[in-house]
Amino acid sequence: MNRGANSASIPNDLILEILSRLPAKSTGRFRCVSKLWGSMLCHSYFTELFLTRSSARPRLLIGIHQDGDRFFFSCPQPQSPYDNSSIVLAADFHMKFGRVEDEWVYHILTLGTENVRWREIICPFSYDPPREKPICINGVLYYISVGSYYSLIGCFDVRSEKFKFLYLSPDCFPNWSRKLINYKGKLGVTIMEDYHGGFPLKLRMWVLEDVEKEEWTRYAYTLRPENKVEDNDYVYVVGATASGEIVLTKQNAYKPFYVFYFSPERNTLLSVEIQGVGEEWFYHNVYYFVDHVEDLRFDVMKTTYAGTSRSPPKQSTSTSSREDHEVRTLAHQKEDRLTFESVNQFDALRLLEDD
């Protein structure tokens, strides 16, 4: 019996629906199945569909810095409400970035094609450089500006290019635990009070309810894990999920490796033990990115041009070639594309074998 004649073919739209639920590296490999699949998976319809599906399942991206190399893992973020107060997840290894033959390679992102330049914007207020990392929420860049006897929240609207400064509560004194977070689309400032490691810990949070009226709402919580976590290491706030859960993590990578999700609305604390992280990276720095979403359009190496010390570009003495040094010409772009095609991040990512 001819099985091919009796078997019904799967519609292309159903194939795309199935593939949109797979990891990015898997969809990259499936481009090689056939010309038809390669065309469908590179189409803008599929990239938008994949982003929609990926946005519904955000992940926690973990980076570990070890001896000049950076290792990236990711694990699914637990969906609330939780059934248990403690769960165990496995981390997926994604990529290793580091030095090539003990020589640093720098990738320079060029925005636009002509008249690329920086513009200076005068800030009406002088301040010391902020120690806390700034955060951008809904087109407004927030940062803490520190004076001699006060702390201000600097608000820079990217669209109008205007500054606004808000006084920060004196109770929100500067310490190593102070953190700016995106709390449900609003600016949140968190600190841990009298913290000496481990649990329980006291967490304070200020939420900016109205920028124009300078209205803040203050919260205070005491975090106690319901399950027994035998760990006295320092944890700190790294961000908040889109659903409003505050994420706390350890400073260093070693077993057992925990991530904590605190829900202010339900006053619950979930501890997540992540396996596969911390076994070989004892006491190395860890970086976290909350609500990480895979996007097939993020193909940075195909639109990025790099310069290395091996073959520096030949300098021209012509005064009319200044812009040629800043922006690659179209002829050079094609050559650069061929050069970096072999080290494309997405292509390298999809060649990794599934565990």
From Swiss-Prot:
Residues 4-49 form the F-box domain. Residues 306-320 have a biased composition (Polar residues). SUPFAM superfamilies: F-box domain (SSF81383). Residues 306-333 are annotated as: Disordered. Coiled coil: none annotated. SMART domains: FBOX. InterPro entries: F-box-assoc_dom_typ3 (IPR013187), F-box-assoc_interact_dom (IPR017451), F-box-like_dom_sf (IPR036047), F-box_dom (IPR001810). Residues 321-333 have a biased composition (Basic and acidic residues). PANTHER family: BNAA05G37150D PROTEIN-RELATED, F-BOX ASSOCIATED UBIQUITINATION EFFECTOR FAMILY PROTEIN. This is F-box protein At1g31080. It comes from Arabidopsis thaliana (Mouse-ear cress).
